[in-house]
Amino acid sequence: MSLHISTMNTRAANRMAPAILFVLSFLPCCHAQTIRPVISEYTAKVAKGSIELVNPGLTPLTVIIEPKSFSVSEKGEITYRPLDKGIQLKLSTMSFRIPPQQSYFIFYEARADVLPAWFVIYASIGGFQKNTAGMNIRLDLPHTVYILPKHSVDKQDIIINSLGPTLDKTHLSFSVTNTGPWFGRALSTELIGKSGATPSSGFPIFPHCTRIIEIACKGSEPKTELRLHLKNFKMEQPLSPAEGTFKCAP
């Protein structure tokens, strides 16, 4: 029997936290395999980069590299597919071994017929000792690449709408739509109240796509607006009086 573990988007991981904790209990202790950087963005015709894979354990590991294209749904769920034909990728290697307590570097060169473009380079890691349940384990670690034009998303291309509270009344939902052809990234988000802000993580804003985000709301203090921080500007979406006085679940 084998156990295959992949990373996933943050909200999906939160929903599956109990299952993930169960799965991670099968991993050998003292192992904290790392891929870095996790994300790389390039504003050049040819993206030239490298990936470092770290094996801090005491046994050698085998690694198989698999590039994939992907798309992201409104709720942040990722769907993978074979690498698009419009992306040309050269890798220094497709498989290798990492000795114990050492690192291995992969070098790559990528270009795309149309920009913006994005893809992921997955490192599928094996060689772990079988755990007490007799399972073989493979761990998938992603390195995501964005090849972008110099022009990023325009402020007028982004539309924010409030969708109200979630069913469990612990979050407020918003849709963020990019109506333009350029890629952008929300570096962070904030739900603003009279006495302060509730921060939340950022997310990519893909061309001609909508993303639904959920931000935790705490206490009964009225909320006044949603704020997105992008590289060159910020967006503010005021809340209506009815939305602002919504009481979150304790």
Feature map (PLM): residue ranges:
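Surface-exposed binding patches on compact interaction domains or structured appendages
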Residues: 57-103, 194-196
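Terminal connector regions
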Residues: 112-152, 222-250
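Short, acidic/polar linear motifs in exposed loop/turn regions
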Residues: 57-59, 177-182
